[in-house]
């Protein structure tokens, strides 16, 4: 009997199924996209992904550790989604970042106007009737007259003296004392007649001198000549304001009928307004100023207008290197009803900008030295979609009536003037004249006052549409002004300075100038640094992708490759597996329905189809570890522990065959 076989017994000690699995595992690796189920695919992904959290969920031992890693991973995913949502919202909010730079700059344009637009001595002829009626109204209201005591008259005296003082102008627009605003009753100041007030009341209040009791208000009523019930009532808590407003209405009507050449001659010349001039330490004169006629301020003059193509610059900052002028305003020739203050008005602006001195001008006092220090800021805003601004104004459906570059104020004034022409048939005096239009006056347009006030009311309430149409300019320049005052001239230098200035003015010594007629003005840069403010997009596509990458790397140690891997596994491969399984099921169902197989006798304990007999694992699929595990197992035949005998070795040679019987016979004996 042969000895037992002592080879490697480890292979025979393993179960047949485990041996096959171990053998296949060495030759067929597991590939994720070929996994038969999504759960196996997810297991493969967690074991092979670069995101550490997912791998730790699979390889961690113990439920607590797995739970902690699941919680951390989900928290990181939640933070990523939150931060990415914030980045996307920030990207679409069109926010901007601001850049500030400093550099040197040229000197701006400086426009100077006398507060009194025209010499009263030259205007008396045109304003004689208006001035007379204004004095009559003051005498009736306050008992005011030159050389008489200023005692206010009672209402009882109006019937006896007021009727004789009515005028043509006051008959059209009488001044009224409102007794009860709620009952809408008023009394005419001159006649004392009671009247019922029609229309809406618009309060133009003031804290100045009140007329009588606090409840007393004064105003006037403007009505449509074609419809007496359609009226607008303007009330004032001060008789001073009421008379001034009434005076300005008639004043604009008169000035609109005077030719421009005549108005220029009635205004102040550059030689009249300017006494001395210095710029950057160098003497200058009226030839350095460009004349400019303003509808409300008469003759104005612009220094460094750039009209000749040259813009002056200053060598350094400080008051000694700026513009220094002494102005002569001639207070004695002021219109007493039109203006109630003395001095000049200036505005600092760019050479391409229109000087809206009535809106943003700075007033200069007489008998004072006014120093104005400047800081210059140039700004540029981004247009759509970052802000609602315009680059050139060409996209605004409003014609520019000013011969200057676009600005929001130009657009608003042009829009109102165009609405005035379209609605009232004439143009308002304080603004440029549109092509083909003419200024309003009583004779040709008797309804213009009522129309103007009603239109202005809509404009203030933003019902005219101008505020919705006009946009801010994307590029604009701004000068921040700092004003300081000092008494000028001083008491010790007043005598000789006024004598010298009078001599320069070519006046006689016995008609020496008064310091209340003079104003000293200095305009200078505090420093020569320009502050440039520009807007740049705070978010763009590159920044968005960078922020996404930063969030993924911060919270999950994940790069763009990881993102592609996630897209491939969770979207492409998972979808492919699900669709492949559904397709195989649909295909099998269709084949079974189309060509049913013949019935076979039922088999008892028939083994389930596995491996390549399974329709899920067809020949189209590449062999994997999972599909190999489904191959049919071999029959379990017990193998001998010793090799079978070699029967051919038991055959005897022929030489011994003949001896065999003898041997057998000998043993038998």
Curated annotation (Swiss-Prot):
The chain crosses the membrane at residues 68-88, 552-572. Pfam families: ASC (PF00858). Disulfide bonds join 113-300, 223-231, 277-284, 389-474, 411-470, 415-466, 424-451, 426-440. GO terms for cellular component: apical plasma membrane; external side of plasma membrane; extracellular exosome; nucleoplasm; sodium channel complex. Residues 1-67, 573-669 are cytoplasmic. Coiled coil: none annotated. Keywords: Cell membrane, Disulfide bond, Ion channel, Ion transport, Membrane, Sodium, Sodium channel, Sodium transport, Transmembrane, Transmembrane helix, Transport. Residues 592-619 are annotated as: Disordered. The keyword Transferase does not apply. InterPro entries: ENaC (IPR001873), ENaC_chordates (IPR004724), ENaC_CS (IPR020903). GO terms for biological process: cellular response to acidic pH; cellular response to aldosterone; intracellular sodium ion homeostasis; multicellular organismal-level water homeostasis; sodium ion import across plasma membrane; sodium ion transmembrane transport. GO terms for molecular function: ligand-gated sodium channel activity; WW domain binding. The keyword Ligase does not apply. Residues 89-551 are extracellular. Originally identified and characterized by its inhibition by the diuretic drug amiloride. It is found in: Apical cell membrane. It comes from the Eukaryota. It is a multi-pass membrane protein. Component of the heterotrimeric epithelial sodium channel (ENaC) composed of an alpha/SCNN1A, a beta/SCNN1B and a gamma/SCNN1G subunit. NCBIfam families: ENaC (TIGR00859). Belongs to the amiloride-sensitive sodium channel (TC 1.A.6) family. SCNN1G subfamily. This is one of the three pore-forming subunits of the heterotrimeric epithelial sodium channel (ENaC), a critical regulator of sodium balance and fluid homeostasis. ENaC operates in epithelial tissues, where it mediates the electrodiffusion of sodium ions from extracellular fluid through the apical membrane of cells, with water following osmotically. This is Epithelial sodium channel subunit gamma.
């Amino acid at each position: 009997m042969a000895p037992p076989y002592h080879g490697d017994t480890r292979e025979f000690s393993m179960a047949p199924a485990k041996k096959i699995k171990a053998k296949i595992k060495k030759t067929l690796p597991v590939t994720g996209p070929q996994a038969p189920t999504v759960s196996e695919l997810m297991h493969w992904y967690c074991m092979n992904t670069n995101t550490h959290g997912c791998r730790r969920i699979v390889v961690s031992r113990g439920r607590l550790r797995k739970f902690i890693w699941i919680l951390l991973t989900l928290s990181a995913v939640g933070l990523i989604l939150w931060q990415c949502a914030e980045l996307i919202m920030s990207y679409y909010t069109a926010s901007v970042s601001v850049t500030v730079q400093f550099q040197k700059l040229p000197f701006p344009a400086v426009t100077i106007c006398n507060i009194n637009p025209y010499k009263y001595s030259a205007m008396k002829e045109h304003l004689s009737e208006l001035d007379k009626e204004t004095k009559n109204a003051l005498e009736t209201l306050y008992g005011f007259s030159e050389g008489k005591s200023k005692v206010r008259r009672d209402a009882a005296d109006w019937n006896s003296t007021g009727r004789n003082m009515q005028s043509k102008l006051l008959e059209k627009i009488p001044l009224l004392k409102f007794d009860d605003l709620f009952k809408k009753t008023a009394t005419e100041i001159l006649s004392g007649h009671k009247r019922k007030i029609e229309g809406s009341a618009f309060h133009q209040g003031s804290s100045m001198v009140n007329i009588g009791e606090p409840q007393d208000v004064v105003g006037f009523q403007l009505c449509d000549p074609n419809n007496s019930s359609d009226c607008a009532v303007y009330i004032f808590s001060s008789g001073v304001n009421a008379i001034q407003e009434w005076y300005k209405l008639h004043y604009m009507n008169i000035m609109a009928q005077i030719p421009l050449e005549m108005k220029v001659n009635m205004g102040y010349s550059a030689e009249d307004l300017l006494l001395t001039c210095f710029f950057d330490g160098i003497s200058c004169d009226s030839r350095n100023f460009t004349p400019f006629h303003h509808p409300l301020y008469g003759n104005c003059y612009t220094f460094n207008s750039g009209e000749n193509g040259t813009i002056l610059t200053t060598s350094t900052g400080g008051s000694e290197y700026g513009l220094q002028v002494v102005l002569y305003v001639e207070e004695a020739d002021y219109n007493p009803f039109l203006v109630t203050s003395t001095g000049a008005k200036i505005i600092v602006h760019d050479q391409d900008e229109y000087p809206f001195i009535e809106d943003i001008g700075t007033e200069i006092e007489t008998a004072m030295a006014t120093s104005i220090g400047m800081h210059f800021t140039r700004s540029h805003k981004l247009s759509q979609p970052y802000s609602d601004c315009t680059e050139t104004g060409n996209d605004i459906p409003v014609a520019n009536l000013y011969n200057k570059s676009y600005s929001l104020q130009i657009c608003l004034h042009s829009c109102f003037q165009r609405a005035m022409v379209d609605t009232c048939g004439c143009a308002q005096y304080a603004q440029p004249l549109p092509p083909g239009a003419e200024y309003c006056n009583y004779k040709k347009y008797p309804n213009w006052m009522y129309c103007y006030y009603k239109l202005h009311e809509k404009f203030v309430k933003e019902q005219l549409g101008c505020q919705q149409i006009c946009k801010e300019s994307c590029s604009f320049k701004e000068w921040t002004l700092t004003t300081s005052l000092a008494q000028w001239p001083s008491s010790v230098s007043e005598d000789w300075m006024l004598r010298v200035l009078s001599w320069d003015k070519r006046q006689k010594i016995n008609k020496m100038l008064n310091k209340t007629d003079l104003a000293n003005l200095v305009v200078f840069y505090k420093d020569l640094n320009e502050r440039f403010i520009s807007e740049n997009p705070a978010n763009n596509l590159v920044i968005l992708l960078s922020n996404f990458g930063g969030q993924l790397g911060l919270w999950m140690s994940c790069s763009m490759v990881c993102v592609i891997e996630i897209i491939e596994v969770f979207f492409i491969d998972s979808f492919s597996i699900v669709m492949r399984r559904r397709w195989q099921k649909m295909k099998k169902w269709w084949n079974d329905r189309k060509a049913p197989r013949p019935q076979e006798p039922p088999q008892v304990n028939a083994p389930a189809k596995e491996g390549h007999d399974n329709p899920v694992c067809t020949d189209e699929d590449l062999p994997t570890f999972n599909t190999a595990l489904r191959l049919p197992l071999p029959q379990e035949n017990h193998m001998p522990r010793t090799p079978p005998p070699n029967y051919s070795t038991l055959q005897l040679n022929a030489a011994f065959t003949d001896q065999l019987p003898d041997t057998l016979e000998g043993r038998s004996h």
